[in-house]
Amino acid sequence: MADRVIEELDRDESLRLISSGGIGRIAYTSRFGPTVLPVNFTLYDGAILFRTAENGPLDQDLRTGIEGADYQVAFEIDDIDMAGAMGWSVLIQGPAHHVRGPEREDAFRACVEPWAPGIRELLVRIVPSRITGRRISLS
């Protein structure tokens, strides 16, 4: 196997890699324990934005029950070349909250259509408090 190197990515490069959106994985602690779910996402105004079902399992798990309190999550995006054993990953950590009020309309227009069937009108935003990334490539 060829020699490979791991490169730490800075915030700007990490955001550049995920700027086109796509599929990411939200990780959080649900009422059943650690949970990781794939979602279609958009990078909007420096934050991760995705849609889910109002009162669905993800919505219920992300509610703290305390007005104004945010739920801390992780969000991972990657692009892997299995044949070449190379790729990159970006990890975003920060609070997740529902998008409501006047900002909802613009955010909703910017958000990608979910692949999952059903009505998914609730917008969730993850505001990055920490962004890290790594790339594995040939040396």
Where are these regions (language model features)?
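Short beta-strand segments
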Residues: 21-54
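Short hydrophobic/aromatic-rich beta-strand segments that constitute the beta-sheet cores
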Residues: 50-52, 75, 133
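Conserved hydrophobic/aromatic beta-strand scaffold that supports enzyme active sites
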Residues: 36, 49, 74, 91, ...
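Short, active-site-adjacent segments that bind or coordinate small-molecule cofactors and metal centers
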Residues: 107-139
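Residues immediately flanking
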Residues: 39, 52, 77-79, 128
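Short, structured beta-strand-loop surface elements
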Residues: 55-112, 120-121
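Short, basic/aromatic recognition patches
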Residues: 3-25
